[in-house]
Swiss-Prot record:
MF (Gene Ontology): structural molecule activity
Protein name, as recorded: Coat protein
InterPro entries linked to this entry: Satellite_virus_coat, Satellite_virus_coat_sf
Subcellular location: Virion
Amino acid sequence: MAPKRSRRSNRRAGSRAAATSLVYDTCYVTLTERATTSFQRQSFPTLKGMGDRAFQVVAFTIQGVSAAPLMYNARLYNPGDTDSVHATGVQLMGTVPRTVRLTPRVGQNNWFFGNTEEAETILAIDGLVSTKGANAPSNTVIVTGCFRLAPSELQSS
């Protein structure tokens, strides 16, 4: 009686699609009330150094801390969109560090092409008016982005 052949031996080894890799990138900014801070590809050192590789936003984590309270709203954009596709809603920063996670909604997670314009906004954070005093609070914000990179074989030429 002949031994049974495994089904695995019949599969093609090279038929799989190229894998994408996840990259985490962090930037530190100062957020001021009544001001909007925008983040482009050039804001994140790793994305900036990736050349013309396309990327997709998986999630943003926003952590803020400050001596004075400040309300803010973060907005996520798709490539080519002028209107935001998702937002955190009004959040409050204070002396205790708070972390907010912002992810794209299903069906709204498109690829930013490798030749994305430097001025194209990926994320924007609005500092909202939160105090009645004359001193406008300034807050330190840590923005960590998780990006999915396209395989290098698919990069723009």
